[in-house]
């Protein structure tokens, strides 16, 4: 089960090396209100969360010794930076970065607590920029003033233009930064920027060492993209398939419930490609037309609900539709003309009650009309209230003892009812989280699942990844840092 939590996506499995590459981290999404303390934000429905000017959790700032800055991850020397909220790269971008360089001024990005490079390996940088007057920029990956890789470009023209370059590292370094400097000074508007390693798994854009770790575990399916991020805390932050496909710079960024923005470089296409590369069955979780019920839920109604239902149907078409279909054509343009596999659809995440059942039924009926082969999964036992149910997702988080005492939990389950998917399971309470004692409790419970696999057909530990510098949930299965 993969969810973008603990910065597991950007800067993790998706190896973007620049944090806040879209310059939007400090921009409040629609439906959020900044609080007077300058740290918290509140949704219009009343959910309070830490924001910390877009840095996320305050403990991340303190624990990682992140210097204060107006625009997260970006710092200036002999230069002035400010967000441009009108003249952006495209309709999906909420901000651009306006730079005014003095002579020998510079702009620096510190990455996800450092940028990691290996001697002899190459890295691809691209940016979109425009300038009223021609301006020369030197780009370098550096550490304490020492240039590890460098290149240069000249920006000209008053329309956004894409500039590409290669940066080849001269030596290893795990605490580097990216610096853009301007010898003569001048003004430039940056619309989007990205720095990625050329070495990715099978050339498909994901971090090689992390995918190899997954491959070594022989996974049979992957549930994606969440998790609570599917629900969001406002209609604007609810996940929509269409926001996660197409060129990276045209995907709108999204503030996740786990306190940070993602640029959605790890999107629907990338998940499906990963499933294909590792032989995993895709299990897509769609938003069912409501935000997180544990975070002051908002219900979508009318056209907004219809739009969300259609988004799910469009996602399925993208995955398995012909290349002549609307969304199949986009898939083909992304390099995959043949259909992917699409095995399972989970309708909602951790949703319940009459409001959920209404929305579940809408999506279930539409999907079965068009794609009867898709296996659907419900969040609760909707069959008890007369709804059709093929499979139900049950989540378990508790103590070691809780799991050890439930080895026989599924022995007496009704074999005439729906199948069971244990979609999230982990010891996350007590004194032994992430230790052998906890693992023994989890193993005991999983043994009980194995002996009842006639009804429990799928199971997955949760969550999968943690970037060790950005912990929002503990424990996880695998731990990562900027350096492989």
What name fits each language-model region?
Residues 1-2, 220-224, 282-285, 343-347, ...:
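Structural recognition of the beta-strand scaffold that forms the well-ordered cores
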Residues 1-264, 281, 296-306, 350, ...:
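Extracellular and organelle-lumenal recognition/adhesion modules and their flexible linkers in secreted
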Residues 127, 218, 275, 315, ...:
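Conserved, mostly hydrophobic/aromatic
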Residues 163, 204-205, 294-313, 328-374, ...:
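Active-site cleft segment of glycoside hydrolase catalytic domains centered on the general acid/base Glu
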Residues 204-219, 268-274, 304-339, 399:
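An active-site-proximal structural segment forming one wall of the substrate-binding cleft
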Residues 223-235, 286-290, 380-382, 461-465:
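Short, solvent-exposed turn/loop segments enriched in Gly/Ser/Thr/Pro and often Arg
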Residues 368, 372-375, 391, 395-470, ...:
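Catalytic-core region of carbohydrate-active enzymes that cleave or remodel glycosidic bonds
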Residues 479-484:
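Conserved small/polar residues in nucleotide/adenosyl-binding loops
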